[in-house]
A protein has these predicted regions:
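Short secondary-structure boundary/capping segments
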Residues: 21, 60-61, 111-113
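Small-residue (primarily alanine) positions within well-ordered alpha-helices
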Residues: 4, 8-11, 21, 31, ...
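Residues that line or immediately flank small-molecule/substrate-binding pockets and catalytic motifs
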Residues: 37, 71, 95
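Helix-adjacent hinge/juxtasegments
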Residues: 41-45, 49-84
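Short beta-strand scaffold segments in enzyme catalytic cores
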Residues: 19-27
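Short beta->alpha transition motifs characteristic of CBS
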Residues: 30-37
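Zinc-dependent deaminase
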Residues: 1-14, 75-146
Length: 146
């Protein structure tokens, strides 16, 4: 998760929300991504989406069955759907996202039993450090706390 936090901080250079994601296969990082919405002017360029695309390109297959995705923040509903489509087996994230989170905060996408793929998940890893990073960012950018 420490590496994911480092990746998230790259977004700060572009004044974007500091969210980072890495994809790990067989204990090795194969891809990473950070929020790039401000740079690309594309609201779908979330850290998780970028990391998933890069991982698929790296291994030459969209099926990331043996991979774990680490993210600083709870994946949103869109990213949770992408994680299912890429067949990620496990997701670990630092802290919840009460407004748009799609894993535990709102729609709980991974808990839908009728889907053809299931994802194990864990959260709360480095939670206070990540909350502090998010709080500092939003206080600076919007004058209010996340």
């Amino acid at each position: 998760m420490k590496k994911t936090i480092q990746v998230a901080k790259r977004a700060l250079k572009y004044n974007d929300v500091p969210i980072g994601a890495i994809v790990v296969m067989d204990g090795k990082i194969i891809a990473s991504g950070y929020n790039r919405k401000k740079v690309t002017k594309n609201p779908m360029d979330h850290a998780e989406i970028i990391a998933l695309k890069r991982a698929a390109r790296k291994i030459g297959d969209w099926r990331l069955n043996n991979c774990v995705l680490y993210s600083t923040l709870e994946p949103c509903i869109m990213c949770a759907g992408a994680i299912l489509h890429y067949r990620i087996k496990r997701v670990v994230f630092g802290t919840v996202e009460p407004k748009f989170g799609g894993v535990v905060s709102n729609d709980r996408i991974f808990d839908i039993k009728t889907l053809n793929h299931s994802v194990d998940y864990e959260f709360g890893v480095f939670e206070e450090e990540i909350k502090g990073m998010m709080r500092d960012f939003f206080k600076k950018v919007r004058g209010k706390v996340f």
